[in-house]
Amino acid sequence: MAADSSCFVGDTHVLTMRKVWRVGGGLVGCAGDVAEIFAFVRWLKDGADKDDYPEMKNIEAIVVDPFGTARAYEGETSEPMVIRNEYCAIGSGRDVALGAMFAGADARMAVRAAVRHTGQSKPPVRVYRLKEKT
């Protein structure tokens, strides 16, 4: 999983932040409202009880479990969608990243393409891998 590091308020780049977390042996990548992202990650760390799903409207997330199964969360629903595609992307750079991966780029290069060709994706690009089972 790879991500850029931009955080915008409206059209203004206000800070650099991490967008991927390790939770329960898996990876969680998020895009959208910063407060909602932190609430979503906290919800996952606390056990992801569907009855306690935070009120959110402006968030996209990809959650990859320790076995490599990817699920997508979108806004108001606590029901994830299983991702069966070979690759996926979220956030402001999604269109460029998807095109780059279709053309053969790995996740790092896809995010680098988004940084180069979109206005709201910014470096540094960070790459995360699932930890090896021992």
Region locations from a protein language model:
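N-terminal nucleophile
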Residues: 1-134
